Amino acid sequence: MAIINVTPDSFADGGRHVGVENAVAAARSAVEAGAAILDIGGESTRPGAAVVSEDEQIRRVVPVIAACRASGGVLAGVPISVDTTRAAVAAAAIEAGADAVNDVSGGTDDGGMIRLIAERGCGVVIMHRLVVPKADVYSDGYAVEPGYDGGVARVVNGCLRAQRGRFMEAGVDPSSIVLDPGLGFGKSVKQNLELIARTRELSATGPVLSGLSRKSFVGRVSLGRDSGPDERLAGTLGLSVMHLAAGARVFRVHDVREHVEALAGAFAAMA
């Protein structure tokens, strides 16, 4: 799953894909590099990012999705997900040609999201996000480790199973649901690593998405220090390979070609 952020302030690629022409070119390059899905988002989830209105998100993502659908060539038929927590944005994106919704709130920020997914029959990624003070929602450098009574894997997996059940009760096809443990969202470095190691406990319920690409905890693990996003590729690839071995099957990434090659090699060795 290639990350196509049409935002000026995303942590790893902010501003790089702003504008329809730039975004479509990035999407085309990602597919040529081996991406199977495009994830297009109009609001950054980096620490401290400004809240973006529904109208502005729609203004950013809908023309890009429509242009991808109209461009043909390598983009013809490639599945597109829209990265949003707002049902109105998701509805507009689906009308423009999106096939799925990637919701970092897991359908909890907007009461209309579950109903929309059920009515439109589209795919959905449900992510776990610990509700902590806003400044800490996306941190992994806590002075005090976030509390997960019973252990982080048990709590996160239980929350995702319960939310998956709510989607299914509304009529969403279980085969269209992907589960995301929310690495880097309200977890310490140690807790992120535990979630990776115990992925099979969650993948027994449904396919698991790995969303660790270039996140700050990756640098703390691989480099032993705070680092910039551009320093985290090698660490990202290493942890992605481990996440594959642990059971993850969808990888949301900035660096498509590198991941395609690394994961293909790892998957062959696992066969």
Region roles according to the model:
Residues 25-41, 246:
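Catalytic domains of carbohydrate-active enzymes, especially glycoside hydrolases
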Residues 10-26, 45-70, 78-79, 84-87, ...:
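Active-site-adjacent loop and "lid" segments of alpha/beta metabolic enzymes
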Residues 183:
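Acidic helix/loop microenvironments that form the catalytic cleft of cell-wall polysaccharide enzymes
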